[in-house]
Amino acid sequence: MITCIIRYHIDLNQKAEFEQYARNWGQAIPRCGADLVGYFAPYEGSATLAYGVYSVESLAAYEQYRSRLAADPLGRENYEFAKRNRFVLREDRTFLKLASSPHPALVSP
């Protein structure tokens, strides 16, 4: 299993547009085969950093997922929405593997 972390630099004046973009991916990404952890918009601290996080089985599975996402009607619409509104100023992808496993569940005090 590999996890893709997308770091976005967004236009701070278009946070609402990014949040709509994130909600759209919340529908399209799982439908196209990735395990979506979520999209995260600025809350405290930096007003221009946002993240998207999802996992796939392998890089081959990632390529298949990307093909399905490009063919998905909402996926295509969301790509165009971002291109048209230009709220994403920069986008970087990093692929990571879990190194801390196994680890226990959260322990509440």
Model-derived features: positions:
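Short, well-ordered beta-strand segments in beta-rich or mixed alpha/beta enzyme
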Residues: 2-9, 38-70, 93-94, 107-109
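Short, surface-exposed ligand-recognition loops at beta-strand->loop->(often short) alpha-helix junctions
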Residues: 9-20
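Residue-level signal for secondary-structure boundary sites
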Residues: 16, 60-62, 101
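An amphipathic, aromatic/His-enriched active-site/gating alpha helix that lines ligand/cofactor pockets
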Residues: 20-37, 56-94
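Acidic/histidine-enriched, glycine/proline-rich intrinsically disordered or flexible terminal extensions
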Residues: 86, 90-91, 96-109
